[in-house]
Amino acid sequence: MVCLECIFYLSGILIKRFPCFSIRNSGVFILKEKNLPQFFEEYLKKGSVFKEKRVLQANHFPNDIPHRAVQIHQVRVVVAPALRLERPSNLFIYGKTGTGKTLVVKWVINGELVSAAKKAGVSIQTLYVNCKLDADTEYGLFTELATQVGKELPLTGLSTDDVCSAFFSKADSTKSILIIILDEIDYLMKKAGDDFLYKITRKNEELKNTQVAIIGISNDLMFAEHLDPRVKSSLSEEKLLFPPYNAIELQDILNNRASSAFKHSSLEPGVVEKCAAYAAREHGDARRALDLLRVAGELTDRKGATSVAVADVDSAEEKIDHDTVAELVTTQPRQAQLVLYSILNISHGAGKFIFTGEVYELYKKYCAKASLRPLTQRRVSDILSEFDMLGIITARVISKGRYGRTREIMLAPQAATPVVRRLLEEALNL
C-alpha cells in the first residue's frame, strides 16, 4: 500500500508527518506540543450550544416518554400482579431499534413497579442483562444473573448446569418475585439456542420462595417463531409490539429533549424537523434522531458557530453513517467480512438486487483464496439476516415457483462506498 504523508496544524498542535500504513492505524498521530495547556484553556473559554448534552444520550432516563402511553399501560398490566406476590406472565417485546422498548421496560419495571413495591412492603427483584453485550452464551447468561443476585462463583470448575443451579439457589433464598429482563434476547438465541429459556421455566416450578418472570426484548419480529415447541409451551408468553415512530412523533421527542439539552435560541428553524425526517426514513429510530441532533451540535461547537444550522444535520448524518459502517465492518468476524465483500463485488454499488446463491458461490471462491473452510449455505444465510438487521443490506424472501424460495439482497447505500471496500480489503489482506 502507498504510504501517505500528511501534515496539519490544529489549534496550535503540530500533527507531524506520519505514514498511513493502513486504515486501522492511520488515526494514530505523533503529536508535538506547541502549547498544549493553552489549547485546553482556550477550549474552555469558547462558548457551546449545549446546556446539558447528556440529555441527548440514549441511556438518559427522561421525565416523560412521548407517544408510548399504550405500551406503558400494557407493560403495567402484565407486571402488576407482582405487587400481590403473584408471578406475572412472561412477556416478549418486539420492535425495531430505537422504538423505546428498553426505555419503557426500565421505566415501568425499575421505576414505577419497584417504587410501588417498596411502598407496599413487597419484595420484587429485577435483573437486567443485555445479551449482546454481557451474555452471549448460556454459561455467560447464568454467570451474569448469579453475579447480579450476589452469588460468588469460582473462576473455573463449574459447568453451565452448576452455574444455573447456583443462581436459582441464591435467588430462592427469600420470598419474592424475580423479573429477569433479557434485552436483545434474539442475539443470545442465535448463538446459544433456546435451551436457556426452557431451563428457566422448568427451574421456576422447583422454587419454594421465589417466582420468576421473563421479559424478553428483541429487534427481530420473527425470532419467537423459531422457538422449540416445548419452550413455547413452557413460556406461555404474552407479546407486545412497539411500532416505529413517525416524523411528527420524532419531532415531539426531540423537542422534549432539546429544551433541556441546548441553550436558548441555539437551534435554527428546521433543525429538529430535519433530524426527525432523516430518522423517520430509517424505520422511525428515535435513537438515530437523538444522535443526529447531538452530533450536529458537536460539529457546530467545533467550528465555533453559535447556533446549529440545517446544514449541520446533513454533515452529522454523513459522519454517523461513515463511523457506524466502518465500525461494523472492522468488528465483523473474518467469515462475515468475506460474505460482505462478496456482496460488494457482485452488487457493484447500491440499488441492485442480487441473490443468495450468487453471493455464496463467490464467497466460496474468496474462502479458497484466503485458505479458509467455507461455512454452510445455511450459516451464510444467517449472516445475511444479521446484516439485514444491522442495516448493511436489505433482504427479502421471494418465490421462484418450482425452484423454491430465495433471498433477494440489496446493499445499503452507506455500505456501498470505496471506504468500506478498502476496509474489507485491508482486513482480509485481499
Question: What positions do the PLM features span?
Answer:
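Conserved C-terminal helix/linker of AAA+ ATPases
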Residues: 300-321
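Short alpha-helical segments that sit at the start of domains
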Residues: 322-352
